């Protein structure tokens, strides 16, 4: 009989017969509290903080809580199959690890640890452009695991082109393009700590190892790290991008392209018109815009847009 996803709970109980208990709490609220106790205010605020007054993050949770499960009884569920097909790939469950940057502020093994965990369970790992570890090293840690690459779309076309070539060579099979970060959000928890990890050279590994990025520096990164950081800040995002610019990505990426941060059904239609393969209905976990519509509330409209892209994953943040 195939192993079910929830079999691990029985392992916990069986281990308890020898006096062993889980090393970490299984309650996510307690796990978050433990993380806040062990990490400094800067990392915690950066990971858990929201834009403005936090209203979008609260709306995300409230919207999900409004969607309730209605169980049905006396159904044959001895064989439970959660597998789905996404972007032409068969996945064991409708689950992927979303891109999270600067993971070294949370764990010393950063993105490599997350990639190994995803591969061990057969779920895709989406690597952030703003990772603490170069994409080639993360790909090696992922092994044969399904891996996708998230792009923060830089001003410099040559840097973007270089990122796409490197990601393809490293075995990343799909491209997720974040659209909802044309500018840095107003995040009070970060501002109150004056903490932005990129200014400390964290989350810049893909840039500092990129030949096109380094070509724009007067000195090597190790000789003038501050100049490298300023160059990164100046070219990280481009608020002037518009829909026709997507043609550049299609010309330079052979695999599926998914647009992350779509909330309006008209934008889902525009994505389809531009030849995109999917959208992620997301508000960046409330990190970018205070007062935004909740992702779960946008999902029916964005996912149901006639003529929209086929694949519509959703993240809460």
What are these regions (language model features)?
Residues 68, 83-85, 94-98, 124-126, ...:
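Short, conserved beta-strand segments within well-ordered enzyme catalytic domains
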């Amino acid at each position: 009989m195939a192993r079910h996803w929830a079999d691990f709970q029985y392992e916990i109980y069986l281990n308890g017969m020898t006096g062993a208990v889980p090393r970490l709490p299984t309650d996510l609220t307690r796990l978050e509290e433990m993380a806040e106790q062990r990490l400094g205010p800067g990392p915690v605020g950066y990971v858990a903080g929201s834009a403005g007054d936090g209203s979008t993050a609260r709306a995300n949770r409230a919207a999900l809580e409004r969607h309730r499960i209605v169980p049905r009884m006396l159904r044959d569920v001895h064989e439970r199959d959660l597998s789905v097909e996404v972007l032409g790939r068969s996945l064991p469950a409708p689950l992927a690890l979303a891109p999270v940057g600067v993971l070294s502020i949370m764990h010393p093994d950063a993105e490599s640890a997350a990639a190994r965990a995803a591969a061990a369970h057969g779920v895709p790992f989406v690597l952030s452009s703003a990772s603490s570890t170069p994409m080639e090293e993360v790909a090696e840690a992922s092994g044969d695991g399904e891996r996708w690459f998230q792009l923060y779309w830089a001003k410099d076309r040559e840097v973007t082109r270089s990122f796409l070539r490197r990601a393809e060579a490293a075995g990343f099979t799909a491209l997720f393009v974040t659209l909802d970060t044309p500018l840095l959000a107003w995040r009070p928890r970060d501002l109150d700590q004056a903490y932005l990890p990129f200014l400390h050279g964290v989350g810049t590994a893909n840039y500092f190892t990129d030949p096109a990025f380094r070509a724009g520096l007067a000195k090597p990164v190790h000789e003038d790290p501050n100049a490298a950081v300023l160059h990164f800040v100046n070219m990280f995002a481009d608020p002037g991008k518009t829909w026709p610019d997507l043609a550049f990505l299609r010309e330079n990426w052979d695999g599926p392209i998914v647009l992350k941060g779509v909330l309006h059904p008209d934008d889902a239609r525009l994505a389809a018109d531009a030849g995109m393969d999917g959208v992620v209905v997301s508000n960046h976990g409330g990190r970018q815009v205070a007062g935004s519509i909740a992702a779960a509330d946008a999902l029916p409209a964005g996912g149901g847009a006639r003529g929209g892209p086929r694949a519509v994953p959703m993240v809460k943040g």
